[in-house]
From Swiss-Prot:
Pfam families: Arif-1
Source species, domain of life: Viruses
Protein's name in the database: Uncharacterized 34.7 kDa protein
InterPro entries: Actin-rearrang-inducing_fac
Length: 298
């Protein structure tokens, strides 16, 4: 019972980690098609450059997703054929490399959490967090401009700019409205996302250890020998049963043919009395039954 519980819990861990990495991987792939799903990080330089981290996430998480699918298909094939896992150097290397790459992705997310908390953006998720300008699913970066203190039109009409007292304004060109310290998916869920990333790292380490242990296990020779002996014993038993059945059939056929060819005076020691008539009647009935047996070749 304990073995089944451990197997079920390990299967749940594999499924949970695969689901998390698959969600992030699919999101990263969608970011290559449209920028609304991109994981953007704005740098605090003079030009406020923006880098798209979705390509890096797809590169690091993709091998793990593909390796996990291949691993599951391999395990199902072994279970279907009734075979055991064998020690495979290439399988161990691929599994370890996939887990290390995926774990490094979550580790980078934790290490650069201060920058991500301040300047990280996922436009489609940010629009779900804020209560204003939900139609603008983009982030083109901050553009710093100067304005004069008497230029009231520049201050009042530009809703996509944030104004400061030092006569500077920061604008986002693709947005219709920008506010001070507006909520994003990263600054509103920093603790939960950090704990989720740390949990993913721990699960990667544990699952990698379990899979390495499975691939390192050599087949049990004693068990294989026992199974082979059992199969040979069953085959010998089936062969003996078939031979016994064929022998019984031959004996029955020979007995039937001998009974058919017996003469009427099979009992010469009997006199012509009522006992002889009874014996003759029995022989006649026996011959009659023998005629009903279908002729078969020996």
């Amino acid at each position: 019972m304990l073995v089944q519980v451990n197997y079920f819990l390990q299967l749940v861990l594999h499924a949970a980690l695969f689901g998390l990495c698959s969600f992030a991987f699919v999101f990263a792939l969608m970011a290559t098609v449209t920028a609304r799903y991109a994981f953007l990080l704005e740098l605090e330089d003079s030009a406020h450059s923006i880098i798209n981290l979705s390509h890096l996430a797809a590169f690091l998480l993709g091998p793990y997703v593909l390796a996990t699918i291949t691993w599951a298909m391999y395990k199902m094939l072994l279970c279907y054929k009734g075979l055991e896992m064998r020690s495979n150097f290439y399988m161990k290397t691929v599994v370890a490399l996939a887990h290390l790459m995926a774990g490094s992705c979550w580790l980078l997310f934790v290490v650069f959490q201060p920058q991500i908390h301040k300047n990280g953006h996922v436009p489609v998720l940010d629009a779900l967090i804020r209560h204003h300008d939900r139609q603008s699913l983009c982030w083109s970066g901050v553009v710093v401009q100067e304005y004069e203190v008497h230029d009231a039109n520049a201050i009042r009409t530009d809703l996509n700019c944030v104004y400061y007292d030092n006569f500077m304004k920061k604008c986002v060109g693709c947005r219709m409205e920008v506010r001070h310290d507006e909520p994003t998916v990263f600054n509103q869920n920093q603790g939960a996302l950090t704990m989720l990333a740390l949990l993913a790292i721990v699960m990667h380490c544990w699952n990698m250890y379990v899979q390495q242990k499975e691939t390192r296990r050599k087949p049990n020779r004693a068990r294989n020998i026992t199974n082979t002996l059992l199969m040979e014993t069953e085959k010998e038993y089936d062969t003996a049963e078939e031979e016994e059945h064929e022998s019984n059939m031959r004996s029955w056929i020979l007995s039937a043919r001998r009974a058919r060819n017996r003469p009427h005076n099979y009992f010469p020691f009997c006199r012509q009395t009522g006992q002889t008539q009874n014996v003759s009647r029995l022989i006649f009935q026996h011959k009659r039954r023998a005629r009903q047996v279908p002729p078969t070749a020996e």
